[in-house]
Amino acid sequence: ICTLILWVGKYATLDRIVKWVILTLTITTIIAVVLVSIKNTTPLSFIQVFPAETNLLFLIAFMGWMPAPMDISIWHSLWTIEKNKELGAEVTMKESLFDFNVGYWVTLILGACFMGLGVFVMFGTGTEFSSQGGVFASQLINLYTSTLGTGVYLLIAVAALTTMFSTTITTLDASPRAMSKTIELLYPKRKRNDYKLWLLILAGGTISIFVFLLSEMGLLIRIATVLSFITAPFYAFLNFKLVRSDQMPKKDKPGKGLQILSVLGLLFLTSFAVGYLLIL
């Protein structure tokens, strides 16, 4: 369905659909967090515990996509270019930054909400969660309904559906755009847009994973998030280099304060990635 929407509707349809999906996701998720926090009777512990070696992989995987992968900046840039084509006018830097910041903060807030749901509903239940996607989804919804009652089944189902749909359709659009742009930059003489070709490749690969590796979805997610975490310093360096290069208009370049913060962030990401690789 997502592939068909992107194939026929292109960016304009994606933009319209995602806005409503994210709005629905945000409302249902926040309501779920409020309800489950009201029902919770277990006191929360705020003692910081350094993860044992066995849990370090989970922490790294968690950081890899929290609140979003580092290459989200590439996705947003490509979507801005596409929006310029759709509108027939150039989106200003102020508008682009506002759009990015809103999306990033919403992602961050939703990430915190999902953490809260995990703490209130999943943590300490003793349930051994399945690595199979369908079984895990069933376990998750059953936990929520047993905690909040069957009346919230539809609310949780809508939140889960919009989460998966928004993630699928945005990734399914952004990755082919990134690959198509990469080929264009590597081979400037090529005039053909390979977006639809990469869309088919990604869709076909995704379906193949579902068919042959459905029982190992947990492992696949860990691999993807860990790789995202390890490659984060590379993307961060490229971003930092680009915004300081001559390709960025002088008036739009970051100030000294933001550049210092960027260097500190780059050192943080690099230190964590190198440290993780050393203890493997």
Predicted regions and their residues:
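Loop-to-transmembrane helix boundary motifs in multi-pass membrane proteins
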Residues: 106, 183-214
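Helix-loop-helix connectors at the membrane interface of multi-pass transporters/channels
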Residues: 1, 81, 85, 171-198
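Hydrophobic alpha-helical segments and their helix-loop junctions in multi-pass secondary transporters
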Residues: 7, 23-50, 59-78, 236-248, ...
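C-terminal membrane-solvent junction of multi-pass transporters and transport-like membrane proteins
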Residues: 17-20, 187, 191-198, 222-277
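Membrane-interface loop-to-helix entry segments
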Residues: 1, 5-38, 50-53, 222-232, ...
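Helix-loop junctions at the membrane interface of multi-pass solute transporters
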Residues: 63-97, 120, 181, 241-242
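Selective recognition of specific alpha-helical transmembrane segments in multi-pass small-molecule
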Residues: 95-123
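Membrane-helix boundary/coupling elements in multi-pass transport proteins
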Residues: 114, 153-183
